[in-house]
């Protein structure tokens, strides 16, 4: 009897179909590690050393502040806003941080799907239309305030992940 490719495929099928799922604790650990990495990257930017996340700058109210309780969907929405802000900044300091935020959002989506609560698509920030004028007037302040508040928000997210946040 000639078996050919079909028999070989059937013989390999059990090996090909066996896929081991990544344990959710590993995804959560990766999420925490990435958050710590982003916080470290922000701290390493030289002009971020002495800035308070509570600093008030006129015209930058669209940059999210700190939230006491964060669900996975709120974390994703917050990160989406920061990602939009950082991608609109011309500074080279924020390119890697913006890429890391994209990866962090993907990890949050995995955590959410493990809890059977898929995250809604993050809405675009309506107030970013006025960001162009703010950037022209105060590019440095926008970067400093955005990174400072992002750092605080990430530290809040890190604490919330230890408490196993809901949807």
Swiss-Prot record:
InterPro entries membership: 4_helix_cytokine-like_core (IPR009079), Leptin (IPR000065)
Gene3D superfamilies in the record: 1.20.1250.10
Signal found in the keyword field: yes
GO MF, one example: leptin receptor binding
Keywords: Disulfide bond, Obesity, Secreted, Signal
Keyword Transferase: no
Localisation: Secreted
Signal peptide residue numbers: 1-21
UniProt record similarity statement: Belongs to the leptin family.
Function: Key player in the regulation of energy balance and body weight control. Once released into the circulation, has central and peripheral effects by binding LEPR, found in many tissues, which results in the activation of several major signaling pathways. In the hypothalamus, acts as an appetite-regulating factor that induces a decrease in food intake and an increase in energy consumption by inducing anorexinogenic factors and suppressing orexigenic neuropeptides, also regulates bone mass and secretion of hypothalamo-pituitary-adrenal hormones.
Official protein name in the record: Leptin
Lineage: Eukaryota, Metazoa, Chordata, Craniata, Vertebrata
